[in-house]
UniProtKB/Swiss-Prot annotation:
Pfam families: Ribosomal_L1. NCBIfam families: rplA_bact. It comes from Methylobacterium sp. (strain 4-46). The lineage of its organism: Bacteria, Pseudomonadati, Pseudomonadota, Alphaproteobacteria, Hyphomicrobiales. This is Large ribosomal subunit protein uL1. Keywords: Repressor, Ribonucleoprotein, Ribosomal protein, RNA-binding, rRNA-binding, Translation regulation, tRNA-binding. CDD domains: Ribosomal_L1.
Length: 235
């Protein structure tokens, strides 16, 4: 623990917790301070001016990161017949129907994203209490209930990141790896922030995107100027 504390203190050196940095400067600072023995995930956190307890202030969506997420995503697909074949051909890791339902009910959830064709939703709906809390329930709003199985599997494998606002009005996601080039991380961060901006709910009042911070898995958070992240949107 002492070693970990020393490493964290070292990572914080040179970072002014009261200062707001540009996105490019923050990315460089995080990469320069990354000393973990694994390829850390680069994370973004956004504080939004919404209260998700109200239905008209819920923020949810999906972002296709232009440079991928850097992680291997296991995809499960509920489908039958030709659509099941399409899912397998597209690279889905698990494909099934009642058999997949039984596997999940038995406690085995060996996937990161779940996709379903519309006709499978009565079956998948029985898994709401299992998949819902894990953020794995297929939803047409984020493109995971669809007849375009090939496209959905490809998006999931290629770096599509789902987001949903939490109780405190925070949206966060992993948007790459510290090993990525600086520009690739910047592009991913801007794409994610733009997706969140476009998902602004009708009930949001006042400043929608209030604060943004970035960090690595094991590193400290760095405050970022929203204007340096939002390319074409107003904070």
């Amino acid at each position: 623990m002492a070693r970990e504390g020393k490493r964290i203190r070292a990572a914080r050196e040179g970072i002014d917790p009261t200062k707001v940095y540009s996105l490019t400067d923050a990315v460089k600072m995080i990469k320069d301070r990354s000393k973990a023995k694994f390829d850390e995930t680069f994370e973004i956190s956004m504080n939004l001016g919404v209260d998700p307890r109200h239905a008209d202030q819920m923020v949810r969506g999906v972002c296709n990161l232009p440079n991928g997420s850097g992680r291997t995503v296991r995809v499960a697909v509920f489908a039958r017949g030709a659509k099941a074949d399409e899912a397998r051909a597209a690279g889905a890791d698990i494909v099934g129907a009642e058999d997949l339902l039984e596997t999940i009910q038995g406690g085995t959830i060996d996937f990161d994203r779940c996709i379903a064709t519309p006709d499978m939703m009565p079956l998948v709906g029985r898994l709401g209490k299992v998949l819902g809390p894990r953020g794995l329930m297929p939803n047409p709003k984020v493109g995971t209930v669809t007849m375009d199985v090939k496209g959905a599997v490809g998006a999931a494998k290629g770096g599509a990141v789902e987001f949903r606002v939490e109780k405190a009005g925070i949206v966060h996601a992993g948007i790459g790896k510290v090993s990525f080039d600086d520009q690739k991380i910047v592009e991913n961060a801007r794409a994610f922030a733009d997706a969140v901006a476009r998902a602004k709910p009708t009930g949001a009042k006042g400043t929608y995107i209030q604060r943004i911070a970035v960090s690595s898995t094991m590193g400290p958070g760095i405050k970022v100027d929203p204007a340096s992240v939002l390319a074409a949107q107003s904070a």
